[in-house]
Regions:
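Short, solvent-exposed loop/turn segments at secondary-structure junctions
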Residues: 72, 108, 146-148, 199-201
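Glycine-rich, charge-decorated loop segments at or immediately adjacent to ligand/cofactor-binding or catalytic sites
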Residues: 76-79, 147-157
Length: 239
């Protein structure tokens, strides 16, 4: 295994033993949940977690922090982006070592029972466009089943790259190639930064030879960095 690994964390995950996690150089950082819609924010928790990364000599070299917003489909996307940005600024803003923001686009927890392609694409685009104006960067779009079901496309949603969830041993469905699977998810290999291979809950999954638990954490959402260029590309994104 040569690809780097990054975990997703939110307040209900297991507590992290940060010295143990940071000592293993296979792990290149963490992406923290910061906000959800216009209703929830986790800035106090997020800042406490972030401080462990910022004080590491690895930070900005082979260790990065990232922040994600859980998008809600019944609230304006641009206002969600402004709220996300306000809380990110509150905990120190984007640093040289911070990955572009990630917007989580999925079905779970939504008040809209049957979202349409136009609705999801439009709200995500509003979020991404507003984030781009605030930060000068393009957001990463995280998604899986919903994007495939609706036929949503990364470019139409305004994302600069993708993070794809598929809990399987290989990055494709039965009888298709990776390229075909990513096309169904609205992206391509050149623009895919992360493959989320394991979740904190459910049966352990993932490709052969890759960990299904993180040191100092245990079961957690695990992402493999598959962005072409690997660490150098990730470092450039976080610069």
């Amino acid at each position: 295994m040569s690809d780097g690994l990054i975990v997703d964390l939110y307040p209900l995950d297991r507590p992290v033993d940060w010295p143990v996690y940071l000592a293993d150089r296979r792990w290149w950082g963490a992406i923290f949940k910061l906000t959800q819609g216009l209703d929830y924010e986790y800035s106090a928790w997020a800042k406490r977690q972030r401080d462990h990364l910022l004080t590491s000599p690895r930070y900005g070299v082979d260790l990065f922090d990232g922040w994600y917003h859980y998008l809600t489909f019944h609230q304006p996307g641009e206002i969600q982006a402004e709220r996300f940005w306000t809380y990110l600024e509150k905990i120190g803003g984007e640093r040289s070592g911070t990955l572009p923001a990630m917007v989580d686009v999925e079905r779970g927890g939504q008040r809209v029972a049957s979202p349409t392609k136009n609705q999801v694409t439009g709200i995500t685009r509003k979020f991404c466009d507003r984030y781009a104006k605030l930060s000068g960067r393009s957001a990463t779009i995280y998604g899986g089943e919903l994007l495939r079901a609706l036929g949503c496309k990364r470019e139409e949603m305004g994302g600069g790259r993708s993070a794809v969830a598929l809990y399987a041993s290989e990055l494709h469905g039965k009888g298709e190639s990776t390229a075909q699977f990513l096309a169904r998810t609205g992206t391509d290999l050149e623009h895919t930064m992360l493959w989320q291979t394991c979740a904190a809950e459910g049966a352990p999954t993932g490709p052969f030879g890759y960990p299904r638990e993180a040191p100092g954490i245990g079961r957690v959402d695990i992402n493999v960095v598959i962005l072409p260029g690997g660490l150098e590309s990730l470092r450039a994104l976080a610069g």
